[in-house]
Amino acid sequence: MTLKNLDWRALDRLRDGFLHGTAAHGPYWQSANDLAAYDLTYGERIGWKWDAVLRELRLRGWTPPATATASGELRRTILDWGCGSGVAGRRVAAFFGPENFSALHLHDHSPEAVEFAARAARTAFPNLGVPRWRPDSEPIGLLVLSHVLNELSPAARAELLVLARRAAAILWIEPGTHADSRALQQIREELRGEFHVVAPCTHQAACGLLAPGRENDWCHHFAPPPPEAFTDGNWVKFGQRAGIDLRSVPYSFLALDRRTDAAAPSEGLSRIIGRPKYFKGYLRFLNCDATGTAELMMQKRDDPALFKQLDRERGPLLYRWRRHGDRVVRTDHAIAGSGK
């Protein structure tokens, strides 16, 4: 199967389930054909979110941890929980190098999905072990979670957090919707006493977006689509047929690690939530730092180059501001990246 001959009957059924919540009622993969069509399209779009998160983690100096086995051997492993077609686990393994991992474990409530994901991983990484994962197996190294929250009942969510507490590190991506993002923010609060928050936050304090009065705000970001999303006619046709704006790829995410020195220090840094809003001669944005969240503004005349850059920046919007009250007057560029 390719983008030219997609199974639209399967894609329409899957998208309808995702949009109307029926995906939470049990396995929705009916065949390997379903998974192949999904992996090429919706799964690949999720992969763009993973690309953005992984680039940010590289900018922050983070690498996956090694964990000790029962025999004392240090190993780096990935557990892609709720793997679906396996795009998340493959993206992580490819980014850090499959040679740096001893195993990629897969779990899904659908045996069909696990089989597809394992086959795809073995094809992509012939020398990487993809053994069957057992819930009672040795400690979890890197736990990878992708678009699972809105498919979990309260009981299943609680069970997942029990599993998460066994991990050495967690990379978790969800859609950039208000509901999914705030649900992930709440999980951050539940786990931050046991893990070091690597990203998206620049601090270890309580989430400012969960403070009273911030109920309408949510922590979301935008991944830059690859050039082929605009230049490949098959992607253009897919976006039109599926009713998806491929220019906008919103997501929320959480990166946690038990190591307190897992990434470069981020004290004093701020993060722009979402995108700045431009007006004539000035802009406004929602800022997050260790003191909480606040609406800040910047006048074009104070820093014309930065004013223009903030509209074009494709990487994480992480800066060290110089402020007069709620007005940004300039910045020391910290680890904002190009997103390429």
Model-assigned labels for residue ranges:
Residues 26-60:
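Class I SAM-dependent methyltransferase Rossmann-like catalytic core
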